[in-house]
Amino acid sequence: YLIQAFPPEDSRRLFAHLQNEDAAARDARLAGYFAGPHGGLAGVDLTDGIRMTMADGVVVHLRGSGNAPELRCYTEAGDAAAAAAANAAALRTVLDRVLAAA
């Protein structure tokens, strides 16, 4: 899933806000935004955007598009319905909470 018409400057602001601290503070911030329904944050990979693995095994991966004004969100979970729910919740969190704080 993705957020279309997501300007590159919003993408830069979003990722700067989520990554602009030491690892422990960054992970606490990410957990506060995204991990609540998943029992906590188990790991973070910053190789290509922000890939968060939750304690329950759900994966939420946020990344800006390299060639379009959009934000992409990929999710993995035990089944398609859980992945879709995690994706919708993550995108809603970005729009309702993260951008307002960035």
Could you tell me what each predicted segment is?
Residues 1-66, 70-74, 80-102:
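Phosphate-binding and adjacent anionic-ligand microenvironments
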